[in-house]
UniProtKB/Swiss-Prot annotation:
It comes from Cuscuta reflexa (Southern Asian dodder). One of its GO terms (cellular component) is plastid. The gene is rpl16. Keywords: Plastid, Ribonucleoprotein, Ribosomal protein. Signal peptide: none annotated. Disulfide bonds: none annotated. This is Large ribosomal subunit protein uL16c.
Amino acid sequence: MLSPKRTRFRKQHRGKMKGISYRGNHICFGKYALQALEPAWITSRQIEAGRRAMTRKARRGGKFWVRIFPDKPVTVRPAETRMGSGKGCPEYWVAVVKPGRILYEMGGVTKNIARRAFSIAASKMPIRTQFIILEIE
């Protein structure tokens, strides 16, 4: 699973996910990409599940880039615990994704293989996504 090696603080505020993604919303490395259409927290497990599904589908042909990284800790309180006594312990890591953000990129494969691989990866995601192709002017 992806997670930061070290952070300055163990716990974070939840924050707001309003607006669209102004960074990380263009294809940079590959020719095809999977773009988010809704805001969400995507866990490191979901990112890894999508990556594995894509690599299985494309076999040895293509190269992949994961464009999101889970850098926000999510704290969870133990079950059947009374209120108070502070915030819970960090349980897992999430990437904050806004609409327009590129999740994965792929290159070195045909359009059909890329579309199929991304559709499998998209089914692992908790949000609606779209398949986009790099347009060179």
